[in-house]
């Protein structure tokens, strides 16, 4: 188990140390490579937050926590957010390995972000609480493997990943992320 974890960390470090090389490839779902939020329709017993029709193709955010409610409110208020959706029943997942086993990571939100460039920035967002080893593997895979692979593919626009550790400060974190890409 420890050997598998060490090998996974070494692999992510090697890939991260060779930026710009198009070695990573995206694994697409053959029958639905692009995905779509317009067909999302499900019942829930969870609390919900209504979304603005001009911001989200899904009418409500099904809430898993107060943190996600606060984050949805923040997204609704930001002009730079052109569209967003909570990744609930969308099927958007990032494959990763933890303790030697293949797993699927379902990030919390997907955002189309206007960073001042002609093409919108697609932002994968994780709302995180306390640090956990499995979460570290998910975040590492998303930032060091998945984002570089999808950006190298070139057909799906620009992508980035951000982890929100304090939803009450999410606007600042998103502004910092936006600033990074305005200068890139």
Write out the residue ranges for each language-model feature:
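Intrinsically disordered, low-complexity, repeat-rich regions
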Residues: 1-106, 112-121, 127-184
């Amino acid at each position: 188990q420890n050997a598998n974890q060490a090998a996974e960390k070494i692999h992510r470090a090697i890939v991260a140390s060779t930026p710009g090389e198009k070695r990573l490839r995206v694994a697409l779902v053959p029958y639905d490579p692009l995905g779509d939020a317009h067909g999302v329709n499900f019942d829930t017993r969870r609390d919900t937050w209504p979304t603005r029709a001009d911001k989200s193709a899904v009418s409500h955010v099904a809430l898993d926590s107060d943190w996600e409610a606060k984050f949805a409110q923040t997204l609704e208020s930001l002009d730079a957010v052109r569209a967003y959706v909570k990744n609930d029943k969308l099927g958007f997942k990032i494959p990763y390995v933890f303790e030697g086993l293949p797993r699927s990571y379902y990030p919390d939100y997907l955002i189309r972000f206007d960073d001042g460039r002609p093409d919108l920035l697609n932002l994968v967002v994780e709302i995180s609480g306390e640090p956990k080893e499995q979460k570290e593997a998910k975040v590492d895979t998303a930032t060091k493997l998945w984002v570089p692979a999808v950006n190298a593919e070139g057909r799906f626009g620009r992508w980035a990943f951000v982890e929100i550790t304090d939803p009450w400060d999410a606007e600042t974190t998103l502004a910092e992320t936006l600033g990074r890409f305005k200068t890139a």
